[in-house]
Swiss-Prot record:
Any one GO biological process: translation
Subunit description: Part of the ribosomal stalk of the 50S ribosomal subunit. Interacts with L10 and the large rRNA to form the base of the stalk. L10 forms an elongated spine to which L12 dimers bind in a sequential fashion forming a multimeric L10(L12)X complex.
Protein name as it appears in the record: Large ribosomal subunit protein uL11
Position of the signal peptide: none
Cellular component GO terms held in the UniProt record: cytosolic large ribosomal subunit
Keyword Hydrolase: no
Role, per record: Forms part of the ribosomal stalk which helps the ribosome interact with GTP-bound translation factors.
Species for this entry: Xanthomonas oryzae pv. oryzae (strain KACC10331 / KXO85)
Cross-referenced NCBIfam families: L11_bact (TIGR01632)
Pfam families membership: Ribosomal_L11, Ribosomal_L11_N
Gene symbol of the encoding locus: rplK
PTM notes: One or more lysine residues are methylated.
Keyword RNA-binding: yes
UniProt entry keywords in alphabetical sequence: Methylation, Ribonucleoprotein, Ribosomal protein, RNA-binding, rRNA-binding
Length: 142
């Protein structure tokens, strides 16, 4: 018999730095899940990623108080800010430009995110990420 799904929990946790403090502890604790078990499993799963990068995770909680989780790739906005060397996007992206990214940097970001993108090919994926960059106030070169 299949386990009954109780709920889905969506969080953004820094890679390799999951601990029982908020947001992980309260989100799992109120559903009766083992917090330390998740922290150890998540940290092991994200050990190959750069420590500190926010990593989206979707936790499936079952009615018997067990869980499974799936990690996604780091959000494009975080990768774009890192590539451009800025701390935040522009408040007025069409008038104030805060940084520059090259096509090569966009292709590297697409390689990181390719599992989560729905684009048909590399060119379409690069255009998608370039649109995100422009909406943050970054200039796309190349």
């Amino acid at each position: 018999m299949a386990r009954k799904i109780n709920c889905y929990i969506k969080l953004q946790v820094k890679a390799g730095q999951a601990n029982p403090a908020p947001p992980v502890g309260p989100a799992l604790g109120q559903r009766g899940l083992n917090i330390m078990e998740f922290c150890k499993a998540f940290n092991a799963a994200t050990s190959k990623l750069e420590p500190g990068l926010p990593t989206p995770v979707i936790i499936t909680a079952y009615s018997d108080r067990t869980f499974t989780f799936v990690t996604k790739s780091t959000p494009a906005s975080v990768l774009l800010k890192k590539a451009a060397g800025v701390t935040s996007g522009s408040k007025r992206p069409n008038t104030d430009k805060v940084g520059k990214v090259t096509r090569k940097q966009l292709e590297e970001i697409v390689k990181v995110k390719e599992a989560d993108l729905t684009a048909a090919d590399l060119e379409a994926a690069v255009r998608t990420i370039a649109g995100s960059a422009r909406s943050m106030g970054l200039t796309v070169e190349g």
